[in-house]
A protein has these predicted regions:
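Intrinsically disordered, low-complexity terminal tails/loops enriched in metal-binding residues
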Residues: 435
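TRNA-recognition modules of translation machinery and tRNA-sensing kinases, especially anticodon-binding
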Residues: 1-429, 438-446
Length: 446
């Protein structure tokens, strides 16, 4: 038997419904914020990620899936979404009409050690906003996942935020960091010794040296900001205050990719015994990225979050977002010739109903059991007698009531009853068993 590859998973059934529900919630939020959907290829030129993430980053040096195609071109499976969207932005000259705001939900690939909530193929929600240096856009980007997590019912949602400042501030900090680390370089891991010479900021994101006492007392980026960068960061915080978003300025929040400038952030939730996976989202501003890819200088800010980790957090907190799947009508053919019932199933589906039928030639009792299993609202039995006398036997699976409905009245009957079942309006007569179609029923549905 051929099995799935390590670090991947099959998605079906209840888990698939959760993913679709989460995607729908995210899409609705993105529509409210006026972001447009974007999709980029799963594989790109390897050079794209080397130029954006940085050759010394863990993503490029350790985790990226690289391969050669039949013409010996170096390609890579997309490890993150921001670089691909930036490439699309430049290649299609989207910079001619700014601002641009995008969202995506796409698979990403990293050769990492698989663990619960972390896979080699994982799906990422992301947002990218191009064209504005306004601090409100940073606050808007942060507010999107913050709002998502609160909407889902997670508690203790908090933003950890820091700033790298502009290019000048970043260079000032890099020099201070090198001066601080130089006497202690022998105490760093082998990777960090290499990073020290190529990109010392990478050391701050090291997983091996995270508990190293030397790194606990490193200089803070905020102390090396020029006035312009400090003012910008203060504006971002002010806008977060105006949105009543809970945040903490955390000097240790440093993103591990080369393209970040100014704002960097992570968002976590208070999930008991969830450990490091409390961090559910990360992002920041990257004003140099488009220009570094040979496009025109364009400010941008964005974030990414993994759906698997978020779904695991929801499961951990006993939050179920999957809608109960139900079927409007289950058609039970009890004739040798199934063509009439098969045509009816198709007709009902074209009218927008969720419809299933029996393809296994079950006995009548077993069909009713299956109808219960799939949460069918109504069953329709079509036997020889029904065809001869031109009526259907319709059963309400909730009340267990059966009615014989004439063939000519069936469509009107089933559509009206399904609509009444979905109605949640009040009734003035005060009777529990009041017909929702009665005159005293205060309903705008009919």
């Amino acid at each position: 038997m051929i099995s799935k590859q390590k670090g991947t998973y099959d998605l079906y059934g209840e888990e698939a419904r959760k993913v679709l529900a989460l995607r729908n919630i995210f899409e609705n939020i993105m529509n409210n914020f006026n972001y447009s959907f974007i999709r980029t290829p799963v594989f790109e030129s390897t050079e794209l990620f080397k130029r954006t993430s940085g050759e010394t980053s863990d993503v490029v040096s350790k985790e990226m899936y690289e391969f050669k195609d039949k013409k010996d071109r170096s390609l890579a499976l997309r490890p993150e979404g921001t670089a691909s969207v930036a490439r699309c932005f430049i290649e299609n000259k989207l910079y001619t009409d700014l601002p641009r705001k995008f969202w995506y939900f796409e698979p990403m690939y990293r050769y990492d050690r698989p663990q619960k909530g972390r896979y080699r193929e994982h799906f990422q929600f992301g947002c990218e906003a191009y064209g504005s240096n306004d601090a409100r856009v940073d606050a808007e980007i942060i507010s999107i996942p913050y709002h998502l997590f609160e909407t889902l019912g997670l508690e203790g949602v908090k933003v950890r935020i820091n700033t790298l400042g502009d290019n000048e501030s970043r260079e000032n900090y890099k020099k201070a960091l090198v001066d601080y680390l130089k006497p202690h370089i022998d105490s760093l891991c082998e990777d960090c010794k290499e990073r020290f010479n190529k990109n010392p900021l990478r050391i701050l994101d090291c997983k091996v040296d995270k508990d190293n006492e030397i790194l606990k007392n490193i200089p803070k980026t905020i102390d090396y900001l020029n006035e312009e960068s400090k003012t910008f960061f203060d504006e971002v915080l002010s806008y977060l205050d105006s949105l009543e978003i809970c945040y903490e300025v955390d000097p240790k929040t440093i993103r591990g990719l080369d393209y970040y400038t100014h704002t960097v952030f992570e968002i976590e939730a208070n999930i008991k015994d969830f450990g490091a996976q409390n961090v559910l989202c990360a992002g920041g501003r990257y004003n140099n990225l488009v220009e570094n890819l040979d496009g025109p200088a364009t400010p941008a800010v964005g974030f990414g979050l993994g759906s698997e980790r978020l779904l695991l957090a929801l499961e951990h907190e006993n939050i179920d977002i999957a809608l109960t799947k139900s079927v409007d009508v289950y058609v039970i053919p009890m004739t040798s010739d199934k063509s009439f019932s098969f045509s009816l199933v198709y007709l009902l589906r074209t009218l927008g109903l969720s419809v299933e039928t029996d393809y296994l030639n079950r006995k009548l009792a077993n069909n009713f059991k299956y109808a219960e299993k799939i949460n069918a609202k109504y069953t329709v039995v079509i036997g020889e007698d029904e065809i001869e006398k031109e009526y259907f036997t319709v059963k309400n699976m909730k009340t267990r009531e059966e009615e014989k409905v004439s063939k000519n009245e069936f469509l009107k009957y089933i559509l009206e009853h399904l609509e009444q079942d979905d109605c949640s309006c009040s009734c003035d007569c005060g009777e529990d068993d009041c017909d929702k179609g009665c005159d005293c029923h205060d309903c705008s549905c009919f």
